Each structure stands twice: as structure tokens, then as C-alpha cells.
Amino acid sequence: IYVPDDYQTSKKRYPVLIINDGQNAFFDEQSYIGKSWGFLQAVKQLNIDVILVAIYCNFELLKREDEYGPWIMNQDLSREYGTHRLVGGEGNAYVTFLTTQLKPYLDQNFPTKIDDYGIVGSSMGALISFYAFLKYPTIFKKCAILSTAFWIYEEEFVNLLKVSSISHNMLYMDVGGQEDDKRYIPSNEHLKECIEGKLQNYQYHFFPNGKH
């Protein structure tokens, strides 16, 4: 958990950003991709007052896919991961933990703005971030999703989006032209079209040379 230097004396309350795949958030030596996202440098350079909560994923074999998968993958998709079991399905329990255990703990122990939470993630971490954003729009009012693996649960997200009340919330979304699976671009474009009719405070960026 990162807190502003003066949080104990300033008497301010701060917005909170939940960071999935949290081992990538701060330090290169902790990142499983070898390079951190540089959140510490960013908040200091931009002079942003925010509490950052970086949550490590379970990086055992297929556990990240289970933990960040809101629904159970179908058999064909599960087999792409080289297993005969069905993958995913623990994401709802994870998001329930965020909303019913982690958020109350943060609000009780840190000077949070209790109605100003955001959530961010990439790839599978983006899937679970977007799921939380749609499932609990009164809690997670801001969301950033990068290189989202929408093709895994494309139909499920389209259906959830139809019944989610996110019209007053904020969303950032991007995808690269050099992702490691050709399904990233069309599935992100499809969800982009569905999202555009749901909220106005929304940015979508396509980076032609962007890699996963």
C-alpha cells in the first residue's frame, strides 16, 4: 500500500486505486514481466494525491486465470491452457473480497475518500478490473483496462454490460496492434462499440505498434 508522504498530518482524504497484478506496480525486481508499471514515479512526477493498493495475483500454474476469471471458461478455451480441467470461475469471489473485506479495511485504517475508488489491470487483470467496474459501479467509479483479453469472455461481458449502470463512471481502455493473440483487437473493438452507448466519460486508444 502506497500512501502520500503527508497522509498522517494533512487531514486530507484520498482517492484509492486498486492495482491488479500488483507485483508489477512499483519495482522492477518484483515484477514478473521484468519491468514495473512505474506507479510510484508517476504519482510523484504528476503530483497526484492517491492511495495505491497493489494486490499480487496468484502466479501458480493457471491460478491467475482462475482468480481473474469471472466465469468458467468453456472446454475449448480451457484446453488452450494445456489442461483437461475447466479454467476460471473464481473472479466473482475475488471481487467480493475486494468490496466486502478489503474496502472496509482500507476505509477504517486509512484516510480514504470512501466514494472514490478506481481499479486497473492488464490482460487477465483487465478482465477482472472491468468485471468489478460493471458489477459494483457505485464502488468502482473509475477503471483502466489495458490489453484486455476480452475474447475469453466476450459474450459474457456484452451481456453484463447491458444491465450495468455505469453511465456516470469513467473508463480508459487500450489495445495494441502487436498483441500476442490475434483475437485481442476484434474483441476489444466489439466491446468498444458496446461501451460507447453506455457512458460518455470514456477513452479508447489503439496503439498500432503496441505489444502485450
Where on the chain are the PLM-derived regions?
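Non-catalytic cap/lid and distal C-terminal segments of serine-dependent acyl enzymes
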Residues: 2-212
